[in-house]
Structure formats: structure tokens, C-alpha cells
């Protein structure tokens, strides 16, 4: 409750973390959510901002029947991600909450998570996050390109 003060849906600070792409014209295609952890100032964010961001998007998309049926694919562009960025989000409590929300609390069909331009220092963070996922979702996490 304390973490979600000022949860305005159009809070620009939150939208610097994630971007929801428009619906595809192809019926049955998943929605795409892009995250760019290296594109923000790490001094402005708390670890709970990631959880807040994801929850706001899921709350908004709950009104879209196509989203619930077709699911979503998350795309992560990790370019320019530094150790300072990772320290903002490398909080096991927030990672666990985020994983549980995505796979258990919302009727969201996670189609995949594709990460590219991932620095090697981010591998341990990704492995920590995967610990909280069920086997089906773990198998859908793909690293496209390491930097």
C-alpha cells in the first residue's frame, strides 16, 4: 500500500521504465511491453518503482479481453545498463513480488521475455529473477544478445 502512493496511470517517471506498444492488427497476436533499464537516471528510482510500473500496466490491460486471451511478450533492451542501474532493481523482495504478480495474480498469458544487449553483469540478476518463476515461464526467458 505504501509503495503505491501517487500511482497515476500517466506518471512520466514510470513510463521511462516501460512502454506498451499499440495493439497488433493481427488477431491473436500478443501485446508487447518494452523495458529499457538503462534509459533512466538510477538516482531517481526506487526498486518499488518497477513493481508499480508493471502493476499499472496490468491493471490497465485487464479491461482488454484480447490481452487476456492473446497474452503478452516482454522485450528488454539492456543497452547502457550499468551496475548502478542494477542496484536499483536488484532487490530479491521486489523481484519475487513482480514474478508472483505476473504469473499468479493476474490472468496474463506470458508468451515470452526476450532480452538483448545484456551486459554480463546482468546475468546474475536475471538468474535471481528466474528463481521465482515457474518452469513454464523460465523456459520462455531468452537472451538474444550479450554485450
Residue map of PLM features:
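SEC14/CRAL-TRIO lipid-binding/transfer domains and related phosphoinositide-recognition modules
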Residues: 1-108, 121-147
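Residues embedded in well-ordered beta-strands within globular domains across many folds
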Residues: 114-117, 142
